[in-house]
Amino acid sequence: MNEAAKTLDGWYCLHDFRTINWAELKTLSTEERQQIINEFLDLMEKWNDTEAQGEGSHAVYTIVGQKADVMLMILRPSMEELNEIETAFNKSRFAEFTVPAYSYVSVVELSNYMAGDSDDDPYQNPHVRARLYPQLPKAKHVCFYPMDKRRQGDDNWYMLPMDQRRELMKSHGMIGRSYAGKVKQIITGSVGFDDWEWGVTLFADDVLQFKKLVYEMRFDEVSARYGEFGSFFVGNLLTAEGIPSYFYV
């Protein structure tokens, strides 16, 4: 059997995409609508407290286009906690005016393709811990997409020897590193958790950097020959201060 890549796993992750029922929202009185907004802000305040304690992170973005209106990205130490947050949101009055559009369940992941030789416990390495248990940046823009490694004929990633996969991922990773300071990337593994194998979440203050990064990577063999990609979701940061105006109708 071919050698499988080993992974380091961090916080569990939920991407929850919702479409807003604007027609129903318009039927509410100003007072009712404000109560719903306040309830959602209370939920966000609880998430802020959790983030301040270093026990998780979150980000809220509006989505451009017809695939969804809002994306909630939640990181927590356990799958149970993700379920609790999802359930609490679904029980809120605000959720009555949303329709689930898409979701993605995964876990923050680092592979051993780029790892050096060391007997030290990687989970005690501050640099590794910062990547496995990240505080999500509140960048102006987000881009999310799921992906697989191709398994077709001669283009079967999983039949390549470990050394060849490691070398390919090294050159692939160098492209991503060249965007350091421009794009923050969170890779989450989802084999056995969702329909795709990985989720990729990109954060940037300049939305054009998403296009530049993804386009450049398409010419790298890892993407050009072995990459399969799902739908792309692009959006803009929604802060607590911006929520009242966003939901004003």
Curated annotation (Swiss-Prot):
Disulfide topology: none
GO biological process: heme B biosynthetic process
Pathway: Porphyrin-containing compound metabolism; protoheme biosynthesis
Gene3D superfamilies hit by this protein: Apc35880, domain 1
Domain of life where this protein originates: Bacteria
Family per similarity comment: Belongs to the ChdC family. Type 1 subfamily.
Chain's role: Involved in coproporphyrin-dependent heme b biosynthesis. Catalyzes the decarboxylation of Fe-coproporphyrin III (coproheme) to heme b (protoheme IX), the last step of the pathway. The reaction occurs in a stepwise manner with a three-propionate intermediate.
The protein's name in its UniProt record: Coproheme decarboxylase
UniProt organism field: Halalkalibacterium halodurans (strain ATCC BAA-125 / DSM 18197 / FERM 7344 / JCM 9153 / C-125) (Bacillus halodurans)
